[in-house]
Amino acid sequence: MQTLYGDAWVIGGIGCVTADLPQGNDLAAVKRHGANHGCRTCNVSNDQYTDPNYNYIKNARFQQQTNERIAEIESQHLRMDQDRLATKYGLIKPGPLNDLKWNQHLQTPQDAYHSMAGKARTLLEVTFNIFNTNGENDFLEYWKRIEKPSHWSRMPNPLRHRQSFMFSDVLRLAMLMPFILQRFLESCHIKTDALNNWHKNSGIRRNLVASKLCACWAIEAKALKLAFSTTMTENTYQELQETLKKNERY
């Protein structure tokens, strides 16, 4: 492979490349996650990320397919045509590891940590955005009061500073959310337009929205707990599968 100091002969093998988002996509020659096709293991479009019926196995990315598409992109004479195909396939110029014999999709897997924590962050954002002023005030009051493990670092106000939260902060807050919401949340804490939208789109009565949201967070916290268990048995895996299916229904 070519290096800054000339050609180098690399002997050895790559088992699995561990990379945080979005650098993992760069290594897999896939556009980043905000693109139309930003998943490095399948061809899902960004408007189908939350579709539970999407067949990600049938639509998986394969090394030979990706190599053919990259060759097709590079064969275009006009930059405009190259950009069009790159957008269509969700691909970028291959990185340095592509000179090695490796499978950029299987050996650069999506990691559960960022997938699960990113989902929890989105749910936090949606939840906080539907609170009215009373909801925000009461949430802060109970968030300050709730018991937290002594070894946790102090978290700033999540309503005002959640954008600066690290994923570890997001996951900790996610574990507290079911208990905080259960202690205070009622329909009067939720914006009227959010209640109306729930009723219109999902048929949920206004007086049931709060309990539905609490149940959603309870399932989310359980899924996170199972996904990051220190040991994973067959029973744990099955329970996680069932919990994630319940999560999809919410």
Where are these regions (language model features)?
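Terminal interaction-prone segments of large eukaryotic proteins
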Residues: T133-Y250
